């Protein structure tokens, strides 16, 4: 490890961080070693990464001292937050600052900050097209990350800003997969109209991040968007039909209807889909499929991801 550049990966047992850890470990000749950062190094997921060869370090992104210790001696750091743990944009911004300040103090030479757009640049709080949430946000889990971009910049942290896309894994873990209606037919529900939604396999986010680290200092200061495909709800339903072997229809609903579904975060996600729909070209433009594949030649299509994961998708 001494002659390899250490990449400290926050959220190493999570969707994005785990993909990066595995990408680094799968490339022993790549010149990098991985430091897997997680709150609890005793979990089965953490132990599995250690068996693959990762260095495990316990740190909590709410605890500045622990993050600085975890970043010390690292060449690079992958910084990510998980809004859905707490539903607090204020906490998310505080965590981003803790990581940025720790990277600065530790002398990290290349940070990747997993971010999203601040939608208020398109839809000001005064704009009534979508409701304002928590008094200060339109899409809280987007806006907090986008607002935090400036923290890395103001501190002079050498950062690449990674714009992610809709996780196809949400069909497994977030209850967004096809559901049976009263007629017994499966329906895939999105409030996207006929507009394409950039999506990606969560594992590929980490692989793309690894591609950024391999390119090195030339990527510092750049904003890089990634996606596996841009697909309409209808196209996704067609793929689900082919792979699952049973008909799945696209159930197009309005953002208003989606916001009213009542599950935790439904209002945030309803606004997110409305932003993606109403500003579709602006949202899709930075998420280049060609650029994503250049970073990650193993980039999966939606159907390829479905074929590998169909048994994991609950069909309610």
Predicted regions and their residues:
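Universal eukaryotic N-terminal targeting presequences
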Residues: 1-2, 315
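Short, conserved active-site loop motifs that form the nucleotide-linked donor/cofactor pocket
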Residues: 53-54, 159
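Cofactor-binding loops of NAD(P)H-dependent oxidoreductases
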Residues: 59
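Short, functionally important structural connectors and interaction interfaces within domains
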Residues: 53, 189-192, 223, 287, ...
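Oxidoreductase cofactor-interface core, primarily capturing Rossmann-like NAD(P)-dependent enzymes
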Residues: 2-48, 62-72, 76-94, 101-112, ...
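A hydrophobic C-terminal alpha-helical subdomain
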Residues: 219, 244, 255-316
